Design a protein with these regions (language model features):
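Glycine-rich FAD pyrophosphate-binding loop
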Residues: 34-58
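An anion/pyrophosphate-binding glycine-rich loop and adjacent beta-alpha core
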Residues: 47-55, 63, 69-70, 105, ...
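Short hydrophobic core segments
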Residues: 18-20, 43, 144, 164-179, ...
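Glycine-rich active-site loop/strand segments that organize a redox cofactor
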Residues: 60-108
Length: 424
């Protein structure tokens, strides 16, 4: 009964809530506030709502991650404790139930990632759009230029050249990533003008740039079931397992994007990556495997002997890095040479010079400080009746549906509390 409309009582005053931004958090906040009995104005400067949402998950929309709260929070490296109340108020199961109730059947895939059965993100956007309309939300395709506040708190927003009065305002403008979808970063500017601390913004869940000359040669090579280790100042920082991709500028893919969220000291630390192409085998077992392969190709040139072990595109690079003459016959390769080959297969180094640009990031790390937001309501501690939801808050997570769940949960909590009637 979470989404039943509340009725207004005689000793309360119906209020107006302005929601800025019609992304995941803003749509959830707007509909939820309307169901509390508020008149809701949803401002979106794009022609269509949910533009960024429509391209998430490569157009499939990874709606959430079907795991319990403790596992969920383990995937939130930045301020996880802030989310206890939000996830308690609107859980992963609540998200799944919500979309099923809106007529969007879901499925759970590897890694507990939840997608619409149709594999079409547009179904999620359309369901939210029709839901907020059904809830009575007024959608205004106008660009908000200012959040209006006086000494006692919020008074409204400036949009379309005029002031729209509002008792409460929810800022759900997202981050600075994917600017082509309309992300401008305006919300951070408004928050600072209203006295909030905005922690430094940077790209997160972003490809990594490498000066390594081998990356362009390996461009387009996709690898599955590999291990990636990131070193910060030569100390092991993070290790992950999964899929990755070589690009003309460096590294990308889910494994790399998740690793990037751990790399937070670009201004004062150096980073490098090591790829283990055969993580299921330790060095001794891999050496045995290589010996077995070699025994079947004794008179073959070394460069032609690795076809069963590696993708074709990778072989010339590994041969070069091993230091073994590509024309040397397999039957003359020494144990020391095999050890050099094993090292390349288990510790393939890639230099990292920096993250990709913030415009290419899936999310923006940093944002309005959680110390200045009430975690049980999402209301500002600085400005009464001002609320925040979604990516604008200084909370971010790994790939896998976690960031969208944060948007649903914080959006719900902000909408629920902002929509409560004022007692007379």
């Amino acid at each position: 009964m979470r989404f039943m409309k509340n009725s207004t009582t005689n000793n309360t005053k119906k209020i107006t809530v302005a929601v800025v931004g019609a992304g995941a958090a803003g749509l959830m906040a707007a509909g939820t506030a309307a169901l509390q009995g508020a008149e809701v104005l949803l401002f979106e400067h794009n022609e269509k709502v949910g533009r960024k949402l429509a391209i998430t998950g490569k157009g499939r929309c990874n709606v959430t991650n079907n795991c319990d709260m403790q596992e969920f929070l383990a995937h939130v490296p930045q301020n996880p404790r802030f989310l206890y109340s939000a996830l308690g108020a609107f859980s992963v199961q609540d998200t799944m139930d919500f979309f099923e109730q809106q007529g969007v059947p879901l499925k759970t895939e590897r890694g507990n990632r939840v997608f619409p059965m149709s594999d079409n993100a547009r179904d999620i956007v359309d369901a939210l759009f029709y839901w907020v309309r059904k809830c009575g939300v007024t959608i205004l395709r106008e660009e908000v230029t200012e959040i209006c506040a006086e000494e006692n708190g919020i008074t409204g927003v400036m949009a379309g050249g005029r002031k729209h009065n509002a008792d409460r305002v929810i800022v759900a403008t997202g981050g600075k990533s994917y600017p082509l979808t309309g992300s401008t970063g305006d919300g951070y500017v408004w928050a600072e003008k209203l006295g909030h601390t905005v922690t430094p913004l940077r790209a997160s869940l972003v490809p990594l740039v490498s000066p390594d000359k081998d990356c362009p040669r390996l461009q387009g090579l996709s690898l599955k079931n590999v291990s990636l280790t990131i070193f910060e100042n030569n100390k092991k920082l993070h290790e992950g397992f999964g899929e990755m991709l070589f690009t003309h500028f460096g590294l990308s893919g889910p494994l790399v994007l998740s690793a990037s969220s751990h790399m937070r000291k670009w201004d004062k630390a150096s980073y490098r990556a090591e790829i283990d192409f055969k993580p299921a085998l330790d060095e001794a077992a891999l050496d045995k495997r290589i010996l077995s392969d070699f025994s079947q190709e004794l008179n073959t040139d070394f460069r032609n002997s690795l076809g069963k072990l590696l993708p074709r595109k990778l072989i010339p690079i590994v041969v070069e890095r091993s230091g073994i003459d590509p024309h040397q016959k397999v039957n003359s390769i020494t144990k020391k040479q095999r050890q050099a080959l094993v090292r390349q297969l288990k510790h393939f180094e890639v230099a990292i010079s920096g993250p990709g640009p913030i415009r290419d990031a899936i999310i923006t790390s940093g944002g309005v400080s959680v110390r200045e937001i009430v975690p049980k309501t999402m209301e500002s501690k600085k400005v009464p009746n001002l609320y925040f939801a979604g990516e604008i808050i200084d909370v971010d997570a790994y790939t896998g549906g976690f960031n969208l769940q944060i948007a649903w949960s914080t959006g719900y909590l902000a909408g629920y509390h902002a929509g409560q009637e004022i007692k007379q």
